[in-house]
Amino acid sequence: MEWRNLPRRARPSKLLLLSLERIGVVDPPEFLYREYDSKATLRCDLMIFVPRSTRYPDVDPWFISTTGFCFPDTYRKAARKALRRLRAIYRHHL
């Protein structure tokens, strides 16, 4: 079970990328995932690492992690979770 980068067929969520760009995150987020079998069920762990914003340098880099059943579902779940976290972290700045 090794961690891998986002596969080429999967593009980062446009809404997430545009939201990050709006708050000054110029480097793209890093996506890492792994798929494995757990009790005969396919599982997927995914992490999104978001770098520091140039517009709000007082906010530290952050990440989210989530677990799902297959990559496409886990990827959508992680993107939604990252958007919620983004809103929570930057609500005092926006």
Task: Name what the model sees in each region.
Residues 1-58, 69-72, 76, 80-94:
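N-terminal segment of the canonical double-stranded RNA-binding domain
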